[in-house]
A protein has these predicted regions:
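Compact alpha-helical subdomains of small soluble proteins
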Residues: 54, 58-124
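Hydrophobic alpha-helical segments and their boundary regions
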Residues: 6, 31-32, 72
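Bacterial N-terminal signal peptides that target proteins for export
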Residues: 1-9
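N-terminal secretory signal peptides
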Residues: 20-62
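Bacterial N-terminal signal peptides
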Residues: 8-17
Length: 124
């Protein structure tokens, strides 16, 4: 079940990425903080799953956001480390699933990631 959710989420990321960067006339431009947070979410998903397709797609998305972002490279490294801390948290599910997507979404919306992003955005 978790793999299906991850694949569904990864496919959504691909669709968003292709719509944003796929040669269309309209391209999405994010703020530096949004690029970092998008990177953090993608990186968390890549670190959380073992499925080759999910890991490859999420890693490609993370790398794309890092390349397009303008914050110091250290911001992206720190975000990845912080994401791994969220993945290590114990989430209980009634079905016994690891709830990786839930952890990554909670990470994306966390105060910790917001603080990290603002710290590096204020250095610019």
């Amino acid at each position: 079940m978790a793999l299906k959710i991850a694949l569904s989420f990864a496919c959504s990321l691909v669709l968003v990425s292709s719509a944003c960067y796929g040669g269309g006339t309209e391209k999405k431009h994010y703020t530096p903080i949004q690029y970092l947070k998008n990177y953090a979410l993608s990186s968390c998903i890549a670190d959380g799953y073992q499925s080759k397709d999910v890991v490859n797609d999420a890693s490609a998305g993370a790398n794309g956001y890092k390349e397009l972002g303008s914050l110091d490279i250290e911001a992206y490294s720190e975000a990845a480390v912080l994401g791994r801390k969220f993945l290590a948290k114990e989430y209980l599910s009634q079905s016994g699933e690891k709830l990786i997507i839930m952890k990554c979404i909670d990470f994306y919306h966390s105060k910790e990631l917001d603080r990290l992003a603002r710290k590096f955005a204020n250095k610019k």
